[in-house]
Amino acid sequence: MNKYTVKEIQALLQQIDDENAPLFKEIVQDERKSVQKLVARWYKQKKQEEQAKRQWQEMSRYERQLFEQGIEYIAGIDEAGRGPLAGPVVAAAVMLPKDAYIPGLNDSKKLSEAKREMLFHMIQSCAISIGIGVVTAAEIDEMNIYEATKKAMIKAVEQLSPKPDYLLIDAMTLPISTPQQSIVKGDANSVSIAASSIIAKVTRDHFMKQLAKQYPQYGFEKNMGYGTAQHLEAIRVYGTIDEHRRSFSPIKEMIEMKKEGKEYDQTHRQSIAGFSS
C-alpha cells in the first residue's frame, strides 16, 4: 500500500463511501500510523453522517406524513426573542422541499453560533420560501409578549409564496384559516420548525448586533437583550432606549423606582438574578 503517499490516501478516502470497497480494504492494511489515523477519522466521519441521517429521518416524520397525504407546501414556524428585556420578537416561517436534506439541523438553542450561521445559509439556499415577521418592543408593551409572538408568526406566514397548505408550529396555535398543528418542542421534533427556529434566531441576533453599534453601553452583541447583570447595570446607569420592553420585569420596577426617586440598589439586582439568560 506504500505505493500511495499519505496525502494521496487522504484524497482517496474522501471518495470512498463503502468500507467494503476493495481500495478501502487495501488502505486499512497500511500499517503507517498516519494512515491509521486517517482511517479512524474516516470511520468517525461516516458514523456522524449516519447519525445525522437518522436524526433527519426522526425529525421529518411530521412532514413525511403530510407529504404522503398529498399536501405539497408545508411551513414550519418558530420564534426567537420572547424572553429578552430588549429588542423585537422575531418569527420565521420556512417551507422546505420534499427532498430536502440539511445535515445537522436541530433546535437553534442546541447549536453554536457558528453552526447556526452555517445552517442559516444552507436553509436559505434550500428553502422553497422563507417569511420573517418582526414585532417591536413598543408593540410588545402594548399587547403582551404572547399576542406579539402570534402577530409575528402571522406576519411571517403572510410573506410566504406560494401560500402554505399546512402549518407546523412550535407550541402555538394561530387564529388563521390555514390547517395547522401545534407541536410541543417542535424545534427538536420537526425539520421545518427547526429550520424556522434557526432563521428566526440568526435574524434576531443580526439585528441585536447592529443595535449594539448604536448603543454599545448595553452589550447587546453579547446578551442579545437578555437580562444579564451587565445589561441591568447599564440600564441603571444609562436608562432605557426605545428597544427596551418597559412592561417587562425588572425594567418596569426600575422605571417606577426612578419615578419615586429611589435607587435601584444591589439588593434589587440580586432579587432578579434569575432574569439572566
Swiss-Prot record:
UniProt KW keywords: Cytoplasm, Endonuclease, Hydrolase, Manganese, Metal-binding, Nuclease
Domain of life: Bacteria
Keyword field contains Cell membrane: no
Keyword set includes Metal-binding: yes
Cofactor: Mn(2+); Mg(2+)
SUPFAM superfamilies given in the database record: Ribonuclease H-like (SSF53098)
Gene Ontology biological process: DNA replication, removal of RNA primer; mismatch repair
Broadest EC class assigned to this enzyme: hydrolase
Localization per record: Cytoplasm
GO cellular component terms, semicolon-separated: cytoplasm; ribonuclease H2 complex
Coiled coil segments of this chain: none
Disulfide bonds: none
One Pfam family of this chain: RNase_HII
Residues holding a divalent metal cation: D78, E79, D170
The RNase H type-2 domain, residue ranges: 72-260
E.C. numbers: 3.1.26.4
Cofactor note text: Manganese or magnesium. Binds 1 divalent metal ion per monomer in the absence of substrate. May bind a second metal ion after substrate binding.
Record-level Gene Ontology MF annotations: manganese ion binding; RNA binding; RNA-DNA hybrid ribonuclease activity
Chemical reaction(s) catalysed: Endonucleolytic cleavage to 5'-phosphomonoester
CDD domains: RNase_HII_bacteria_HII_like
The family this protein is said to belong to: Belongs to the RNase HII family.
Record's function text: Endonuclease that specifically degrades the RNA of RNA-DNA hybrids.
PANTHER family according to UniProt: RIBONUCLEASE H2 SUBUNIT A, RIBONUCLEASE HII
Record-linked NCBIfam families: PRK00015.1-1, PRK00015.1-3
Protein's name in the database: Ribonuclease HII
Organism from which the protein derives: Geobacillus sp. (strain WCH70)
